[in-house]
Amino acid sequence: MIKKTVDQLNNLSKIINQNKTALCIGTFDGVHKGHKLLLEKTNFIAKKNNLKSLTIVFKKRPREFINKNENQSYLSDLNFRINKISQQGIDYIYPLDFNNEIKNLSAKEFLCFLKKLANMNHLIVSEKTKLGYDQLSGDDLFTLCENLKLELTFVKMNKLNEQIISTSTINSLIKSGKIEKANIYLGDLYNVKGKVIKGDQIGSELGFPTANLEISPEILAPGDGVYACYVNIENKSFFGALSIGYRPTLKNNHERKIEVHIIDFNKNIYGKSIEISIVKKIRDQVRYESLDKLKKQIKIDINNIFQILKSKKYE
């Protein structure tokens, strides 16, 4: 729930007041199973020690600030991350800008900053975490926390079949169209939100009207292909056939399109914001010899997608 979000520094001090906190910190892009393990541990420690659980969420990745050439797309925007973290039962969420001041702090200075900012008593981090410009980690970080009279807990990296669950791994899977595996790592369906814009009406001419989606350039769109998905419009869910790519059968196909045919839906939704929850890749983008052959394939795709979503065979 967004009401748990603390927007201003002074508000954080008022809310925390005399309550010491168990704190975890990160960007939490995608809020995947690895993040959820960290959040669960934070909640557990907070309840066990009569503390408040607090998650500090960097609005942007710190490495973007350090390395201006960093350009990896995000899996989720800030609002999505806050909502997902809130669903894990965290008491308070504080969005934080990573800036020059924070960038130039040593690990000791950064811990003192967190202690003062959030009345931190216990820090929970992954075993691979490095803090400060001096990149303190492991035993050195543990010793520093002891000296500052802070508790520190390392959480082991969450793995699936010996593969570490990480945002970068999920990013690569989604780029390559391996959406089902990405969803397993996420612990949820990959979600893309965007605004419906005017298209060229080719879908309508073929008998399968589509909603053309404009998404934030910062958010990752899956690799080219046809996908089974759910479409959420004003809190109502519909089955959808999602197409991403350059539409190789059509002329003037120089622009990558994200468009979804919403099954058994015929309302005007231009200008509305919709959410796509992507379930499974059905096939690659293919160039057909004629529009008739494309039309036949779309019909097959929609039937396959309907059966998959109806039977929930992807679960």
Functional labels for PLM-detected ranges:
Residues 64-148:
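N-terminal Rossmann-like or analogous alpha/beta NTP/dinucleotide-binding catalytic cores
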Residues 12-77:
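N-terminal catalytic cores of NTP/NDP-binding nucleotidyl/phosphoryl-transfer enzymes
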Residues 32, 85, 123, 182, ...:
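Residue-level signal for inorganic ion chemistry
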Residues 2-13, 94:
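Short acidic-hydrophobic, aromatic-tinged amphipathic segments that line or gate anion-handling sites
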Residues 2-3, 93, 152, 276:
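Generic structural signal for residues in well-ordered beta-strands
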Residues 50-54, 92, 151:
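Residues at the starts of beta-strands that form the adenosine-phosphate
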Residues 147-243:
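Glycine-rich, Lys/Arg-enriched anion-binding loops that position phosphate/diphosphate groups
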Residues 199-315:
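Phosphate/ribose-recognition catalytic cores of enzymes acting on nucleotide-derived substrates
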